[in-house]
């Protein structure tokens, strides 16, 4: 049992989850962002020495395009290596300034010029140079990219793997419903090659899905003639022609099977098969046994058979018959006459040897290779006159050259496996023995030498005809063995290669000049196309998305997303049901639950928790090995293709203490089916019960009790939870909350172990353990700067809070600070609320939610949102716009929040419509009235040639200004506010660096003191030779004088020298870093063209929960808050405690998400146990008793294989601390598919001294009467979703109108109105409310004169309206006239 105990880190000791899992975890949850981080690391290969780089990523792309030779061949540009520079701005600066985070790519190339005169290509001269090839975006630690100041994620694509696929049309093409088989060779890049049957059983080919050609044309173009084609595809029967009558057949008995002969088949006198009877397998065996080698058959048996070779008269050389002719009686007579001894015919029959290629040859118009090439040229380039050269080049470039065609390693591996070859490696072009043997360039000779006698195209056609003949099966394209994942790195490489190919064309042009004019590589290469391609991909590709940053879970899930859409993938409209459906191979690779609802359902998936990609890009999942019924801890990853061969048991298969499978028959999966097998036949077993689901679904407790549709909503809605002001860990979790928070990157984790030295709200300083300190200038101090109140992509607030205190001892990986939605390093998306399931005055009709006022008072669901408002001053034609506090026609009061530069103060509380940045725009000269002229004359020019264009707070928003940033264009003088911000920023950075240096210095001196105190000195300030160095002596010395000590001991002397060097090195480094930072702060900003100044104002908006906000549990139980009721009116328990939330019980049965009920019961038990611990602590119970109670909670009912909680590791103090943290409730973990059972929940309720039914008597808060039956009450983790009524609701009086129809716009963003749609019109019609209807359709909508007149009437106090002609009617008239139908209104 001991080996199942785990040791706890500092953070974990603060709070331990009671785990109900029966299976101990074999594999820890892997690093969740690995698919992104690893893929991009392989693309960059930044830390790999140039000569050791693998053929991947940037290196592979550069290698494939270089060397570039000039057209004459006298100059070439070769690739040597590349290196990435340092990024100019770090991540934080890029976010602030709206820049992209990337590093410059410098490629070393070598220009080689050959001597024209010499025949041996002697080198004239060589020049090597570094060339800048644009910025390459860098990935942040958390797997995101910063593009133009915003964080973006590039998610992976699931696309069809390159290779060869066989399929049929499911009988849809032809009216007879006949299955037409087809094959398609898909390369990684290059032309697709299809083969397909038509209803008449002829075989055709298509190139790039153009019009079809008989397949024999393609083979003829490769160099095969009719005889060779027939010999490749058919077996041949040989007939010997007797000179006078009859024919001898060389008999292969097997080939007669299924035939019906019109003569007796006999062995000597013994008749084996009578005439007219069908020959069966038994007859064939008899013939083989009898050893019949030849068979005499009548002439008419030969007539109508197909010749395999041309038949020539030996004496005259006359052609008697062509290959593929059906033999006629006349031809047979001619053969006899010419003395032809033997002829070969094709062995075909209707059952399993179809004459497909023979049929095809009959419809093939071409006779020679050139004709075939010309035919292909005409199909690819219709309308262009073909020449021999052009036709040959076009055909060669289609499939046989690396520049234009690439199967890739994956494609070649899939291709070879499918056509039944053993080796997985090979060429990335299509190889054909005949075609390459006829060419005599170097490359062709190499290919022929390596691959000799194979042919890719012939083998595909052979497999296709086999399938048509009924041997072999077609492929399933939704099988994950036929779909592979393309991750960031690979897509970036493809884009980079595309950019390089564009560069290559330009370089080729210039290389010829390089010879004559002596250009350098830098002058030859223009990096623009590469940079443009990369920028386009990262900025606006379909797969590059604005990161979903609502909470840590949404970040992690977004990065683990796998999409079938995007370039080279499917489109929403064309994707059918099969592609979207769950496939057996998804098990353990792609989540079967989490996918968006709506048009993208099934096309966008999430990786399963343990899934990873293999070297070929196929998804694989881990399994434990099983040998002779014993389950081992060895883990092996299998891809969908490999898994096909094995029998795999479920993770919850029963095992005993020795890990032997105990059941007689174990439930297993084999080749996509579920079945029962004896333990001896099992090969593997699942690693974990949550193997099938993704991270989001694995966070839903009791998932196994929820209906799949609701589980999907539950998983999706957790990603929309808004981080609350104070996060609360879920009382009922699943045990992977810690892993999600750790990998999301929102918490601060210790890089090295040590002791907390110093701490404040924005910084944590750790003094590192001696053992973990590196050599050199490493001073053994880690400084962590925390993120304070920053805006996320979704306008939620990112803020980190320290968790540790000075003096705490921490280990590597411990959580030092919590981020948004985390609580002591665990994901905490919502709040634990006391919930009752009961109706309450109709306020929970249709899933509405009734809240207690206490929830609002305690700020349980208060969230902070940070809005960024931008004001831009541009240079206009009439003059520059100006940011200032001097704004025409605005009251003093409106400006009282602005400083003299016209920018709002930090800390100002602003409401909708308030001015935040004053800005004036010059306006054109207009005709002045006499009054204005007078004002001009008195007050000078400035009075009215500018208009107010200030930045105001948008309607419906109020908040506090928390930050202001002013960006000024280079070369324009900064205003006072900008200078102030700059100075304070420099001060802050200086203080930061000073503090860091001081801490480092102190640490170095402290280490030095420990190394020299008590040692003998040879001399020093006020110290005689032979004296010992004491603490008191050192305290009396100035720090800088320590280095004057001369020590007797060499080690001590080295320590002093080393310390001095370290301090000097750090001082230098900090000075350099500060100078760099200072330069960045003071330099001008790189703003968009025409922009002089930009001011960003950040508003913090506090949103309390209110009716209209959307909330949800984790089981898809969503609803909208309908009412907030005073706490005294809420139902309460016998103890007097009122409930927080009342939910509708009718929302449970029909939705079948019973998990929420179990969660409520277990949550109540968890809270009850916490209260019990609180009572024990208040009563100051002995620690031993508390220890016993905790042991009873954690370890009472652990299963054989489950992990136990070892409380003996806890000192009494730590145990009391743990107890204090459990007062709020003992957190539980019920892992997915391995959770708490009903009995365990009941036991927990019993231990907490709560009713085992989970129900209790409630009383009505308004009357005090008991309700007529007991109610289910308990704690549920409830979330507030980012669908807030404040963001959705707005009011419009007069606003913008659409240009053509003159009807009000719609939507909050356009400040639009409410649409009065056709259904609403029907309602008014039904009531006969004619005048209301007229008003709705005219003056309140698009009757322009009418609505203006009505406004005047209201101003004048006349309450009447005249309805005119709606503008939409005029539009209709114009539309009809555009159809040339005149329509006039009669007066």
From Swiss-Prot:
Q: What is known about its subunit structure?
A: The RNAP catalytic core consists of 2 alpha, 1 beta, 1 beta' and 1 omega subunit. When a sigma factor is associated with the core the holoenzyme is formed, which can initiate transcription.
Q: Which gene encodes it?
A: rpoB
Q: Does the keyword Transcription apply?
A: yes
Q: In the record, what lineage is assigned to the organism producing the protein?
A: Bacteria, Pseudomonadati, Pseudomonadota, Gammaproteobacteria, Lysobacterales
Family in the record: Belongs to the RNA polymerase beta chain family.
What is the role of this chain? DNA-dependent RNA polymerase catalyzes the transcription of DNA into RNA using the four ribonucleoside triphosphates as substrates.
Q: What pairs make up the disulfide bonds?
A: none
> Which NCBIfam families does the UniProt entry name for this protein?
PRK00405.1, rpoB
Q: Which InterPro entries match?
A: DNA-dir_RNA_pol_bsu_ext_1_sf, DNA-dir_RNA_pol_bsu_external_1, DNA-dir_RNA_pol_su2, DNA-dir_RNAP_su2_dom, DNA-dir_RNAP_su2_hyb_sf, RNA_pol_bsu_bac, RNA_pol_bsu_CS, RNA_pol_bsu_protrusion
Q: Which GO terms describe its cellular component?
A: DNA-directed RNA polymerase complex
Q: Is Transferase among this UniProt entry's keywords?
A: yes
Sorted alphabetically, the Gene Ontology BP terms of this entry are: DNA-templated transcription
Q: Which residues form the signal peptide?
A: none
Catalyses which reaction(s): RNA(n) + a ribonucleoside 5'-triphosphate = RNA(n+1) + diphosphate
Q: What is its EC number?
A: 2.7.7.6
Record GO terms (molecular function): DNA binding; DNA-directed RNA polymerase activity; ribonucleoside binding
Could you tell me what this protein is called?
Answer: DNA-directed RNA polymerase subunit beta
Which key words tag this protein in UniProt? Answer: DNA-directed RNA polymerase, Nucleotidyltransferase, Transcription, Transferase
